[in-house]
Amino acid sequence: YKHLGGGALECIASRLSKTPKPLCFSLMVTSKCNCDCDFCFWKHKKGTDDMPKEEIIRLLTEAGQIGYMDSILWGGEPLIRQDFAEICKASHDAGLYTKIATNGWYLETNPDFAQYTDLMFVSLDAIGKAHDDIRHMPGICDKVISGIDYHKIHSPKMRIYVCCTVSTQTNFEQIKEVAKYCKDADILLYFTVNKAASIPEEAENVVATELENEQLSQMFVKIKEL
């Protein structure tokens, strides 16, 4: 039953109990990615070896046994893994409300994950070539939109959110276009902001794309008015 309603009722019940359960088990299943986003924390770690599938399945199984309620599977680009559907199945079978984060390139070529996934976050920072340029991946905007359309038809039980990263590489007009697309497609939209915070020396590329706090404040005032 925890897969119904986004697990909201169980989350509320857990928070109100004397022994609340841990909420979300976050797992980076690969560092590999076909994009080269300037604001990515992990772009310099693409050569790192991936955790074996068997180890990932063990961790997810134990997370379920411990009492975790949700999982979020991410990367890199998790759909690069040809065994990703098996990983999602392990999370689902462990009783976890299973979420994934993807750049959307492989949504149609590696689609089997969806039958075990409750919620998918897909990155879309602008519409058309502007998004391709931000992700340094020609054609990815078309792949995202086509992939979303595909899963709306073939995976109707999986909830879809669009994730728009706010940075120096996006402007309000581009964000408005993403918001219009989401409204027309009846998809929920949320925003992320990447900040290097305590490790600026390890993420100089992220620092270079950060908006100043005042700029962020002004941007989100405009976003709130959409």
Enumerate the language-model features and the residues they cover.
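Conserved Rossmann-like nucleotide-binding pocket used by diverse enzymes
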Residues: 25, 29, 72-74, 161, ...
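N-terminal pre-core extensions flanking Radical SAM catalytic domains
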Residues: 1-47, 64
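Radical SAM enzyme [4Fe-4S]-AdoMet core and its adjacent flexible, acidic
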Residues: 94-97, 116-119, 123-226
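Short strand-loop junctions, especially beta-strand C-caps/beta-turns
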Residues: 43-45, 76, 163-167
